[in-house]
Amino acid sequence: MIVQSKNLKSQNTKFCMVRFGNVINSSGSVIPLFRKQIAAGGPVTITHKKVTRFFMTIAEASSLVIQAGEFAEGGDVFILDMGEQVRIFDLAEKLIYLSGRNITADDNGEGIQIQEIGLRPGEKLYEELLISGKELKTPNNKIFKSNEDFPSDEVLVNAIDDLKEKIENNDIAGIKNILKNLIEGFSEV
């Protein structure tokens, strides 16, 4: 919203955004964590057996950023077609087998245990890359864009001022209410 608002005020610069999936082997990617857990003998921890995520390579992420700059008209959101979501449980299984290990149901076996630790607050079972708006084509058939709705500059400035006040007063309910009214799909945690 802030980037989209900034774009409206700019005459010389086009502002746009990219929405990433999980970048394989980046610092925050689950794959290095799983490899470390497997090397330590397990368990491999997942939040939920049904969680799915999109994945992209570092090269795809870099290309998305560069091409988004080329395709930008201003205020756009660019998203890479990353194919189907991957079930994290299946990824954990494959990495265990690729390491030459087996999976065990408990920590007394010879294999690696996959342990569900529960969803974190606000974590979803699946990712939604397109929040609102339509999926629009770009010159690259693997990259699409979405022109998502956003509040007027006046509404945004007022909301930010209200947020600052609620934060200073530690008004959690007030903060959540502002975010709920401002952000489509906002989920209270």
Feature map (PLM): residue ranges:
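Strand-loop microenvironment adjacent to phosphate/nucleotide-handling motifs in alpha/beta enzyme folds
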Residues: V3-V189
